[in-house]
UniProtKB/Swiss-Prot annotation:
Name by which UniProt lists this protein: Phosphatidylserine decarboxylase proenzyme
Organism: Cytophaga hutchinsonii (strain ATCC 33406 / DSM 1761 / CIP 103989 / NBRC 15051 / NCIMB 9469 / D465)
Biological classification of the source: Bacteria, Pseudomonadati, Bacteroidota, Cytophagia, Cytophagales
Quaternary data: Heterodimer of a large membrane-associated beta subunit and a small pyruvoyl-containing alpha subunit.
Names of required cofactors: pyruvate
Modified residues (Pyruvic acid (Ser)): 188
One GO cellular component term noted in the UniProt record for this chain: plasma membrane
Gene name for this UniProt entry: psd
Biological or metabolic pathway of the protein: Phospholipid metabolism; phosphatidylethanolamine biosynthesis; phosphatidylethanolamine from CDP-diacylglycerol: step 2/2
Length: 220
């Protein structure tokens, strides 16, 4: 278990603030031992909570070109047929994974291939389960084309708490299934838009593990 690089700055600021807070408490209230201990315990709890937000467990990924794997840890909250209007302009199967603040927040490539389309959208910060969060919130859209010419759209969506999306890919870059393509600080949601003829292997409310859980399979 390591700490993700996206957490270094946040952890530094949190540590500095908590250190200063405890220093001031000890300095101005030298006799208030109960207050000192209470603030210290609360500070440690806050630090541990923030620390777990940025944990980055090591995972062994088994690449399978016939599978679409989970891009994030979380829970499946949507499985439905929709018309995807940003890129495909046709019917696709949408599978959405909600990432709580207590999930690992790194995002992984669902398939291997070439990035055919990428776009960042500034936007609102509606709660992740809001029906319009997929189209109105801050988000990124990434389309990867596999070697078999299947196209998968992955959408990172910021939420009410997650107010910063990070990505590590560009159009025409080559990506590998299971490798990190981005990070959403403090959770939120990742949507997948897959072909209608792909066989879905997950169910609503199922827990997913990024890079491990098989979301769907392409028909051979």
């Amino acid at each position: 278990m390591t700490i993700h690089k996206e957490g270094y700055r946040s952890l530094f600021y949190v540590s500095a603030f908590l250190f200063l807070l405890n220093f001031l408490i000890y300095y101005f209230f030298p006799e208030a031992s109960i207050l000192q201990k209470t603030v210290l315990v609360i500070s440690l709890l806050i630090f541990l909570v923030v620390l777990q937000f940025f944990r980055n467990p090591s995972r062994t990924i088994e690449i399978n070109d016939n599978q679409i794997i989970a891009p994030a840890d979380g829970k499946v909250v949507v499985i439905e047929e929709v018309i995807e209007t940003e890129y495909f302009n046709e019917k696709r199967r949408q599978i959405s994974i909600f990432m709580s603040p207590f999930n690992v927040h790194s995002n992984r490539n669902a398939v291997s291939g070439i990035v055919k389309f990428f776009k960042y959208h500034p936007g609102k910060f509606l709660v992740a389960w809001h029906p319009k969060s997929s189209t109105e919130n801050e988000r990124t859209t990434t389309v990867v084309q596999t070697k078999n010419n299947e196209q998968i759209l992955m959408r990172q969506i910021a939420g009410a708490l997650a107010r910063r999306i990070v990505w590590y890919i560009d159009e025409n870059s080559k990506v590998t299934q299971g490798e990190e393509f981005g990070f959403i600080k403090f959770g939120s949601r990742v949507d997948l838009f897959i072909p209608l003829d792909a066989k879905v292997k997950v169910s609503l409310n199922q827990t997913t593990v990024g890079g491990k859980t098989v979301i769907a399979e392409f028909y051979s």
